[in-house]
Amino acid sequence: MLLTVFCAPRDRSETTFALDVSPELELRDFLALCELESGIPAGEIQIIYAEQPLQDPTRALGNYGLKDGDVLVLRQAERLRAPPQPTVPGLPRIDFSSIAVPGTSSGQNRNRPQQAQRPSTTQPPPPQATTSPGSGVSPQGLDNPALLRDMLLANPHELSLLKERNPPLAEALLSGDLERFTKVLMEQQQDRARRDQERIKLLTADPFDLDAQAKIEEEIRQHNIEENMTIAMEEAPESFGQVVMLYINCKVNGHPVKAFVDSGAQMTIMSQACAERCNIMRLVDRRWAGIAKGVGTQKIIGRVHLAQVQIEGDFLPCSFSILEDQPMDMLLGLDMLKRHQCSIDLKKNVLLIGTTGTETRFLPEAELPECARLAYGPEGREEPRPDEIADRELAEAIQRSVQDSGKMHDM
């Protein structure tokens, strides 16, 4: 029979594997197979079926009611401490911690002689904090919000990833309020634990239940999405970046203009403000007024039937539709590009005018107009950009953390 095992280890991500076994196979032999597949020691493996743990290692799988196609949950139990060795009265106990191990002991331990101690009462080991599977708490400081906050503030790369992948937690971190950060962190850990519990219940539920099938389908779909994004980030990280648009330098009626080259636009357009700067508003034919429809809608004031555009040393005739509220000054549409047989050469990063053979380069980001830049400076803006606000908040949070640390040392 074919059994599907959902593995939930302590320190790794969940995995799923299938085993083709006989119903007469004993549980202890099945645990050995699971150890080979998962890498978890058999002594730490706990098998759960129908929300009940399988306890008897000598019992056959078929006697537990397992059938072909069933789903089992493999959980990694906590390591059990070895019981303390009983002391024999009258015999001394040797302190093996003082024995130097070559290559690992410090200079103090090398020179320290072995000492015999009198029999003493065995002290119980200190209790260790145990975490339930899926709680999201790991030894890396997640159970200490203050330590985690200091680690993130000291690592700009991790902080940028946190702002991208977990904005609520990043916002709480940059606020400088430790209580708020702890609250958001605990809520997310509890939510993750709840989702893990629901996933375990889902895997042990009746596979023929319609609600269970719908949840399984959604789980598979979400897993495929995450896997697809992970592969994309590893194999093609450039697809997550942004590219600057294609702009060229030109002149309209002797006035310099930065024109946006858009082969997807049907007509060449110009903003009303740019038309006023170029002194061609007097040529606008308002009988051609209307509405321009694309991603949104904008009002067309009218049309300039003929004007002269200078690109490098060429003077080209062109017509414009004047838009009332347009952020970019000028857009060269397909009507202009086809009329002059223009070619966009991305390898050379130039626009080739086919009728004259003239080439003009596309502008780098530093020369683009303000509205087209991905990262622009603060000149000419009254309000700061979001990344500037985030940088300022980060600096303030680091300063508050340093002050809090200083107060704690003084106390």
UniProtKB/Swiss-Prot annotation:
Motif stretch (Ubiquitin-binding): 387-406
GO BP: cellular response to hydroxyurea; proteasomal protein catabolic process; protein processing; regulation of DNA stability; regulation of protein stability
Domain Ubiquitin-like: 1-81
One Pfam family linked to the record: Asp_protease
Active-site residues annotated for this sequence: 262
First-tier enzyme category under EC: hydrolase
Stored Gene3D superfamilies: Acid Proteases, Phosphatidylinositol 3-kinase Catalytic Subunit, Chain A, domain 1
Region described as Disordered: 82-144
Keyword vocabulary terms for this entry: Aspartyl protease, Chromosome, Cytoplasm, Hydrolase, Protease
CC annotations in GO: chromosome; cytosol
Cellular location(s): Cytoplasm, Cytosol; Chromosome
Family, as annotated: Belongs to the DDI1 family.
The protein's role, per its UniProt record: Aspartic protease that mediates the cleavage of NFE2L1/NRF1 at 'Leu-104', thereby promoting release of NFE2L1/NRF1 from the endoplasmic reticulum membrane. Ubiquitination of NFE2L1/NRF1 is a prerequisite for cleavage, suggesting that DDI2 specifically recognizes and binds ubiquitinated NFE2L1/NRF1. Seems to act as a proteasomal shuttle which links the proteasome and replication fork proteins like RTF2. Required for cellular survival following replication stress.
Subunit text: Homodimer.
PANTHER family documented for this protein: DNA DAMAGE INDUCIBLE 1 HOMOLOG 2 (PTHR15397:SF3), SODIUM-GLUCOSE COTRANSPORTER REGULATORY PROTEIN -RELATED (PTHR15397)
Stated name of the protein: Protein DDI1 homolog 2
Organism: Danio rerio (Zebrafish)
